[in-house]
Amino acid sequence: MLVSSHLERLLVFVFEFIFIEIGFPPCTPRPVSTSSKGVTIESSHSDMATSSLHFASCDTQQAPRQRGASTVNSSSSTKVDLKSGLEECAVALNLFLSNKFTDALELLRPWAKESMYHALGYSTIVVLQAVLTFEQQDIQNGISAMKDALQTCQKYRKKYTVVESFSSLLSRGSLEQLSEEEMHAEICYAECLLQKAALTFVQDENMINFIKGGLKIRTSYQIYKECLSILHEIQKNKLQQEFFYEFEGGVKLGTGAFNLMLSLLPARIIRLLEFIGFSGNRELGLLQLREGASGKSMRSALCCLTILAFHTYISLILGTGEVNVAEAERLLAPFLQQFPNGSLVLFYHARIELLKGNLEEAQEVFRKCVSVQEEWKQFHHLCYWELMWINVFQQNWMQAYYYSDLLCKESKWSKATYVFLKAAILSMLPEEDVVATNENVVTLFRQVDSLKQRIAGKSLPTEKFAVRKARRYSASLPAPVKLILPALEMMYVWNGFSIVSKRKDLSENLLVTVEKAEAALQSQNFNSFSVDDECLVKLLKGCCLKNLQRPLQAELCYNHVVESEKLLKYDHYLVPFTLFELASLYKSQGEIDKAIKFLETARNNYKDYSLESRLHFRIQAALHLWRKPSSD
């Protein structure tokens, strides 16, 4: 009972910390899977031939003909052979990457209840649509599709007696007991389980769904561990299988992605997860994904896209901002060649340009990403989010407002965050410009609290943060107390200063804005928010100065915040986040031991503040990178 209780709570933590913490739709075409630690696969591609990425050779134009040729009448119960399932799923992936989303679904739909790979591909696209739209009907459709997919995969799994079912897969007998088709069924079943678990968490916030979702993750995790052992056995005995490379690709994708995702979690959560058998190893995860990417399986592209998501998105939001742009560019190059107008490919291309500091180029690519297709508006919303931030970085406030307004009107992902950002951006404009928009800033801030939502039983951290900040405009107060630089504060929360650090001109312009706010504060009458506002300005000023290579002045700003700790009344998050910035500053000056000491102080001495989990993610990433040299 104790283990079950731990399992329930800890698996909820996994989703709270990874799926919820990012607070924005994922950028990869499918959720990631599970892993095992301590089993290192010797790579036959140790040099990670990122230039040797293999795409499915199937011609997307031949999809209808192939479907008719490779299968039998759908009215029969005949199973589709493994070769046909793999080929058509590869074609569907190419269609998806070419923005032909409906074509991909229609190719897979007729055989989704007969073929495990048709079922996996079809349900994955439906689930992705549900996650991106956040419409309740789409979520229900996704759950239904994934339930059917699990039933289809179950048809192909090896059947065992009641007695045998009490033992693990490998202890039931020798490797020869599993046919090649049954091995693939295990991989497909594990992938479907994990996706269904994700939707179970999103669907409702009751405890029963928590337990159901947690057990699905646990089962998926165990299947991947067992498949990894099978993979090693096949390699050891040099057994011949026609589609071994596809099975290997599935194992590398699942174990690699799960290793990578679990390694991101704060140390205290990892220790608890290890108690019930979970573990994560970042180097092993990246190695497995790189090996999968350099293979020729259908999942090679998915391994690449997972690494790209890690480098271009996760490393920035949940990390230190130290991104392996070079590897991201190498991985993306063959995608750009084969899918030059693919929305997902263009999105990654724009993200890479953004991380390099090429904001103008990124802006153009994001706009192109919007223009190339109308079928899935959800990709537009991803681009609007990025375009909004680019304009914030450039302080083009009216244009930033335009994109924030589009998000408020069209996207359901986080209305509270969108409305808060719209109000925050309007707060940066002169009053006459705000009047021209026909918006009321106070009214917008007051709407935030009513728009917050819960996922997996938890509020989104950024929404909770927005709600707390918006309380200064509450109707219960005698008068609103204006927020200071709210758009730049949110920019800091999303690690935007890391991107701006590549551009001296933008950092200088931001410093001017911050110093104007600093001067305005000094001329205002003292109130209960004054110390908090002053400390926020000092933190933002320190970030600008650090980006401009003025470390001594930056350190003075940061120290002011830390020394004001006992005077803060509301924004207690400022001190631990400032300690993180001090650590980053010392690390840039080569004082690694001092930097680590500040990280540990921020991690161990503070709790129950806004965005605590986000900071713990960043601390974990920094400790991982700074304590030893890394080739990531």
Swiss-Prot record:
Keywords: Lipid metabolism, Repeat, TPR repeat, Ubl conjugation pathway. The keyword Lipid metabolism applies. Disulfide bonds: none annotated. InterPro entries: Iml2/TPR_39, TPR-like_helical_dom_sf, TPR_rpt. Belongs to the TTC39 family. Regulates high density lipoprotein (HDL) cholesterol metabolism by promoting the ubiquitination and degradation of the oxysterols receptors LXR (NR1H2 and NR1H3). This is Tetratricopeptide repeat protein 39B. It comes from Macaca fascicularis (Crab-eating macaque). The lineage of its organism: Eukaryota, Metazoa, Chordata, Craniata, Vertebrata.
